[in-house]
Amino acid sequence: MDNNLEIKDLEKIAKKVRYNIVKMVGLAKSGHPGGSLSATDIIVALYFKLMNYSPDNPYKKDRDRFVLSKGHAAPALYAVLSELGIIEEEELWKLRRLEGKLQGHPSMDTPGVEICTGSLGQGFSAAVGMALGCRLDKLNNYVYVLLGDGECQEGIVWEAAMAAAHYKLDNLIAFIDRNKLQIDGCTEDVMSLGDIKAKFEAFGWDVFEIDGHNFEEIINTVEKAKSMKNGKPKMIIAYTVKGKGVSFMENNVAFHGKAPNEEQLKQALEELSE
C-alpha cells in the first residue's frame, strides 16, 4: 500500500494491532488470540507495504485480494482493517456481540472482507478460484491467502493446491502460518504434516521458507515471488510463534481458542504497551 513505510513503521503498526487483538478478544471473553497474534506481521506487511490496495476504494476491480483462510484469526484482520480506517475502532470492542457488526469469523457483510471463511480449507479453495477469475478477466493483480498449518490437514487444501498448479496461477501467493500448534495440541501429534515444503513442491508450487515475524524477509520473499512469472503458484511457509508478543500466550496451545481473563488481559495489555 505505502512503499515509503519503513520496517520500524510496520513494527509499530503490528504492535498496535496486537494490542487491539488482545483487547477485543478479552472484552468479548471469546475468540482465538494465539493464531491471530502469530499471523499479525504477515497481514500487516501485506496491507501496509505489499498489496495494491486502497482503503479509499477497497473494492476497486484490479485490487490485490487477501483471503484469511484460517478464519478463526479474524481479530487480526479486523484490527488491520481498523488501522486502515475501513472498520471503526469502536466496532472492535463489540466483537462477537449482538450489538456489534464483527463476527467470530470473517463475513462478507464486513467492509474489506473478500469472502466468508472459517470452515478450514474453503478459503484457500476460494482464493484459487479468485486467482483464476482474475486471470480470465485479464487483471494484472495478485491474490494472497493465509492458511493455518493445522488447516493443511484438510483434504480440500490439496485439491485446491492441485488445481492452482494445473491452471498455472502464478498470480496466487499463499502463506502458511507455521506456528506448529492447533486446538488439540502440536500439529505433528494430531496429524503430522511431514515435509510440507516437499509436498507443495510435488504439487507444482514454488515454495519459500521464512521467519514470519521478520518484516524484511516477508517483504523480500513476496517481491521475489511476484518476479517469478513461471506459471507456478507460490507458497511461503512462515515459521511463527503462536501468541506472539504476550509472554504467557507464546507457544501456549491453551490460547488457541481461549480469551484471557481480567488479570491476564491487564498483564497482556501492559506487555504490549511497553
UniProtKB/Swiss-Prot annotation:
Its cofactor is Ca(2+); thiamine diphosphate. Its EC number is 2.2.1.1. It comes from the Archaea. GO terms for biological process: organic acid metabolic process; sulfur compound biosynthetic process. SUPFAM superfamilies: Thiamin diphosphate-binding fold (THDP-binding). The keyword Calcium applies. Transmembrane segments: none annotated. It is an enzyme of class 2 (transferase). Binds 1 Ca(2+) ion per subunit. Binds 1 thiamine pyrophosphate per subunit. Belongs to the transketolase family. It holds the Pfam family Transketolase_N. It comes from Methanocaldococcus jannaschii (strain ATCC 43067 / DSM 2661 / JAL-1 / JCM 10045 / NBRC 100440) (Methanococcus jannaschii). This is Putative transketolase N-terminal section.
